[in-house]
């Protein structure tokens, strides 16, 4: 497989693909194609087919050279990874041998000022991973103070969320907040940080990004979709980058890897048979060398599991946190 251009090294890529254990003739799904790092490693590990999904059309366009160099073994699909099962069915692969997911924003997106993800690069306050739906500027312009506070607290775990929300409401009365620098400067007036600590706007930007892209809902649905498409013995590998994501993955795999017993009085409460066997009792983390080469790897956690022959469980109900549709509807 030959290809020009710099090679992207995915976080915990070797470890994630090692968990998948690709084999000749297998079909694998990269739910978050990005720069194609995991896909390349899977294609190089064995004579496999890969279906790669990304909601960012720029990532899909940038992957064209890789498609050309892999002689029909790679299919790129512009879609959300929550639609993974439908994508596989459309590609004639109703069951697959492995699924890998790298959750959150990509380094390419963060490094592009015009995507509006970074408080360090001034650009339009966008933050969308795809090309549709409300932007972060729309949310900041229309959400109520209470909704903003909840969003920033729940998705950013920012203890000063009410102060930040109040400052945003006050600032937008004077002028629209449409750039990343404008928002970062507003947050910095109420959230202080000492030298060596994270930037004051870190948690607020994380919260808005997660909210705008409905990332946690997407993750819930993608995990459930992977459960449905993986064949017995198929493997799931998920790399997450903060506690909210990791908690969802850990809980999902934990719930689906144990059998809860009912009582003789309520035998109907017996849970479904385990649909996964957990392969990582503790998450795999990056070593010192990888962290030195890529500081983003410091917070990464990799969890893996193998599909059993049991039927997929009923999809979980989504938590009752604020939704993009409800907040935007209330703010109009």
UniProtKB/Swiss-Prot annotation:
It catalyses: cytidine(1402) in 16S rRNA + S-adenosyl-L-methionine = N(4)-methylcytidine(1402) in 16S rRNA + S-adenosyl-L-homocysteine + H(+). This is Ribosomal RNA small subunit methyltransferase H. It is an enzyme of class 2 (transferase). The gene is rsmH. GO terms for cellular component: cytoplasm. SUPFAM superfamilies: Putative methyltransferase TM0872, insert domain, S-adenosyl-L-methionine-dependent methyltransferases. S-adenosyl-L-methionine binds at residues 36-38, 54, 81, 102, 109. InterPro entries: RsmH, SAM-dep_MeTrfase_MraW_recog, SAM-dependent_MTases_sf. It is found in: Cytoplasm. It comes from Rhodopseudomonas palustris (strain BisB5). GO terms for molecular function: rRNA (cytosine-N4-)-methyltransferase activity. Specifically methylates the N4 position of cytidine in position 1402 (C1402) of 16S rRNA. Belongs to the methyltransferase superfamily. RsmH family. The keyword Methyltransferase applies. Its EC number is 2.1.1.199. The keyword rRNA processing applies. PANTHER family: 12S RRNA N4-METHYLCYTIDINE METHYLTRANSFERASE (PTHR11265:SF0), S-ADENOSYL-METHYLTRANSFERASE MRAW (PTHR11265).
């Amino acid at each position: 497989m030959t290809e020009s251009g710099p090679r992207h090294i995915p976080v915990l890529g070797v470890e994630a693909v090692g968990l998948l254990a690709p084999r000749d003739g297998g079909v694998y799904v990269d739910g978050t194609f990005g720069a194609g790092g995991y896909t390349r490693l899977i294609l190089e590990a064995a004579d496999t087919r890969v279906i790669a999904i990304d909601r960012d059309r720029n990532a899909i366009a940038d992957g064209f050279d890789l498609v050309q160099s892999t002689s029909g073994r790679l299919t790129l699909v512009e879609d959300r990874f929550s639609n993974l099962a439908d994508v596989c069915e459309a590609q004639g692969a109703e069951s697959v041998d492995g699924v890998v997911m790298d959750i959150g924003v990509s380094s390419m997106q963060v490094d592009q000022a015009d995507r509006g993800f970074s408080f360090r690069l001034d650009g339009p306050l966008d933050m969308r991973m795809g090309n549709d739906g409300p932007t972060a500027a729309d949310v900041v312009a229309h959400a109520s103070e209470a909704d903003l506070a909840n969003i920033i607290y729940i998705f950013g775990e920012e203890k000063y969320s009410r102060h930040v929300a109040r400052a945003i409401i006050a600032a937008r009365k004077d002028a629209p907040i449409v750039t990343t620098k404008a928002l970062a400067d507003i947050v910095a007036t109420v959230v202080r940080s000492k030298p060596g600590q994270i930037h004051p706007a870190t948690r607020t930007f994380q919260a808005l990004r997660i909210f705008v892209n409905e990332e946690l809902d997407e993750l819930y649905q993608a995990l459930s979709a992977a459960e449905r498409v993986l064949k017995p013995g198929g493997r799931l590998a998920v790399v997450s980058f903060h506690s909210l994501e990791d908690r969802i993955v850990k809980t999902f795999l934990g719930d689906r890897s144990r059998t809860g017993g009912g009582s003789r009085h309520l035998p109907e409460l017996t849970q479904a048979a385990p649909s996964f066997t957990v392969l990582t009792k503790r998450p795999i983390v990056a070593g010192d060398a990888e962290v030195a080469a890529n500081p983003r790897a410091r917070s990464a956690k990799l969890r893996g599991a193998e599909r059993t022959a049991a039927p997929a469980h009923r999809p979980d109900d989504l938590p009752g946190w604020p939704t993009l549709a409800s907040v935007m509807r209330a703010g109009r």
